């Protein structure tokens, strides 16, 4: 029998690992599956996207016989953003591969997948938190009543329009004890979205540790003054519907006053005829320029493998009318 040699590509094959990486990323995404993926930028020049959104002209009015109807000005808003890249890289020594302990190549693959998935989810949630519609004041714990108030903010004209509510795992116990909560095992397979724990007030419920806990509040008597250096840090700690600027002051909230901000995302269009047209944009859109790729570099003088994962994309809140931020006491 001829001798066989194990080559480097037998251990680290970027093409094979890239496919596995994509599969693992998809499995680990928590929020991204509830955004629409737009691939119109793939394979075309340019890295900037302008997202339009028409404003409603209002309902029609009664007009008397022989009277000329007044014209209504159409208005639109838009946001422009630049495609960015998310990257993560790890180094593996040849010695660690040779040792055969712990499968370092497989572990690197899993860690890179988790890293890219986490970044995309963070960006999706950040866009959801730009929504202007909110419900509650954060003084009551999560409940059926509070979620009904949040869900009806959409003013749906059709029944049964699918919505997804994201809660922090710390809120799960309270919700499970609510008599109006229906656990996922009570539904037929395929009815619930992947990973949903149940349904309440017309919303399927998913858990995510990325749901924001508000620990600071804007206050003119606050002890911390906002500057360019700490603006991003404290903006992430206050109610997302509050916009901080340099010179503002914030104060820490006592534990009893802290609250979660739970996004409720409307998943369906109000009408099948207008689904995801310019007039009926989805809540959040991921503009994918280049899907996740994996590159492998070998440095023989150091006997080190570098594995680098990257994804080029942009995320935008494309329809703020389809996101409500529900506030519930910690």
Segments from the language model and where they lie:
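Sequence/fold signature of self-assembling virion shell proteins
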Residues: 2-34, 42-45, 77-83, 178-330
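Short N-terminal helix-initiation segments at or just after the protein's N-terminus
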Residues: 27-36, 54-56, 103-111, 269-272
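N-terminal low-complexity, intrinsically disordered segments
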Residues: 45-78
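Long, contiguous amphipathic alpha-helices that act as assembly "spine/axial" helices in icosahedral shell
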Residues: 51, 75-137, 155, 159-165, ...
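Flexible glycine-/small-residue-rich
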Residues: 53, 169, 207
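Short, solvent-exposed loop/turn elements at domain surfaces
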Residues: 58-62, 174, 214-215
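Extended, solvent-exposed, turn-rich assembly/linker loops in the middle of proteins
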Residues: 130-203
């Amino acid at each position: 029998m001829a001798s066989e040699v194990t080559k480097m590509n037998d251990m680290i094959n970027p093409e094979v690992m890239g496919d596995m990486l994509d599969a693992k990323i998809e499995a680990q995404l928590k929020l991204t599956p509830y955004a629409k993926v737009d691939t119109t930028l793939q394979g075309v020049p340019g890295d900037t996207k302008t997202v339009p959104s028409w404003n409603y002209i209002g309902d029609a009015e009664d007009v008397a016989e022989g009277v000329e109807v007044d014209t209504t000005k159409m208005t639109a808003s838009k946001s422009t953003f630049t495609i960015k890249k998310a990257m993560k890289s790890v180094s593996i020594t040849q010695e660690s591969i040779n040792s055969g302990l712990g499968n370092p190549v497989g572990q690197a693959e899993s860690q890179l997948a988790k890293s890219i998935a986490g970044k995309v989810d963070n960006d999706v949630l950040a866009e959801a938190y730009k929504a202007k519609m909110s419900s509650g004041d954060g003084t009551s714990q999560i409940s059926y009543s509070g979620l009904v108030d949040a869900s009806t903010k959409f003013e749906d004209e059709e029944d049964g329009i699918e919505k997804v509510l994201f809660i922090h795992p710390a809120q799960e116990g309270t919700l499970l004890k609510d008599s109006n909560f229906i656990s996922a095992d009570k539904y037929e397979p395929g009815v619930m979205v992947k990973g949903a724990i149940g349904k309440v007030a017309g919303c399927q419920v998913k858990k995510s540790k990325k749901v924001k806990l508000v620990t600071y509040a804007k206050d003119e008597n606050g002890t911390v003054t906002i500057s360019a250096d700490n603006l991003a840090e404290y903006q992430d700690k206050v109610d997302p519907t509050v916009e901080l600027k340099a010179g503002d002051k914030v104060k820490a909230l006592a534990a009893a006053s802290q609250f979660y901000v739970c996004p409720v995302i409307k998943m369906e269009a109000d009408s099948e005829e207008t689904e995801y047209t310019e007039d009926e944009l989805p809540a959040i859109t991921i503009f994918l320029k280049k899907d996740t790729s994996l590159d492998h570099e070998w440095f023989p003088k150091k006997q080190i493998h570098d594995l680098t994962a990257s994804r080029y994309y942009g995320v935008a809140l494309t329809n703020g009318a389809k996101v409500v931020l529900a506030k519930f006491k910690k």
